[in-house]
Amino acid sequence: MIVVGIDHGTSGITACLMENKTVKSIFKMKRTEINENSFLKELEKHVNLQDIDLMGVCYSMGDGIDKITDINKVENRGVINLEGIGKKVGGGTRVYDEIKSSNIPAIVIPGLHKGVKSMDERFNTLFSHIASPEKISICYNAYKTFGFENFILSDISSNTVTLLIKNGKIFGGFDACVGAVGILHGPLDLELIRNIDSKKITANEAFSKAGVVKVTDSYKGVENTKFEIMSNYKNDKKCKLAVDSLVLSVSMEINSLMFLTPEKNVILAGSIGTWKNPNVSEMIKENIDGNVLVLNGESGAIGSAMIAEDILNGKKEILGISVDF
């Protein structure tokens, strides 16, 4: 059985090729690269496309579907629209359309939004959207890897999204624009709201630079800013303050969900959550009274492949989300 998982992230598209539960290869294409190159031609370097049994696809916010759905049943790529979601480059759209037109069997993973009825209704009342599709993939990877039925998952990268899993189902959580900051994205504070009202910037522009990048002079685009900030942690005061502030913010978000999970299992993921120097996970552990573990690797792409494989094996529900395939 050969499956492929796709993670549509802020800085690029990551693909995982898995055969019989074993990861065979992983590759990443920057979003700017995809505009000049075919994703499927790159994938073909790793596998005969006709041998693929199923692909698990993440695209954008995933707020137009509420089930894990056969790509041929999905309208408008599974989104309501592309407004208000951060900087748009177009690479993810091209990959999605390539996959759909290829006739390779594929499922599209939804985001977590108020239409997903398996979540606690209080979270759906509070927030219209909680997470983009790859966060479900990361959660499923963590669920399969560590075997916990109850845990908090915090994915820390360009943005931070923290989710709570109870009894093997996603219970709720905090989206990138609500709680903790990431490197690029974050919630809007008073100053940003005033700048929006005075039409100095749009709300989307504010969100796109409301992360700890605002502390520094280190913006290098969506693909390179995190490397600039993290690599200068020890020799640039602003970069150090940025990372220390991010750690505080994420720790606050995780702790805010801790009372809902007595087991106190916490799993950190994402490029920043797994960053070794500085060791972000150890910094967060100092602020958390719980069992803190790290999910290394390209967790979203691997999780998407795991979802595809288990659906082929007959699973009709993933973390509480129904399957229509």
From Swiss-Prot:
Looking up InterPro entries in the UniProt record yields: ATPase_NBD (IPR043129), Methan_mark_12 (IPR016735)
Superkingdom of source: Archaea
For this chain, the annotated S-S bridges are: none
SUPFAM superfamilies, per the entry: Actin-like ATPase domain
Family in the record: Belongs to the UPF0285 family.
UniProt-listed HAMAP family: UPF0285
This protein's name: UPF0285 protein MmarC6_0247
Identify the taxonomic lineage of the organism of origin. Answer: Archaea, Methanobacteriati, Methanobacteriota, Methanomada group, Methanococci
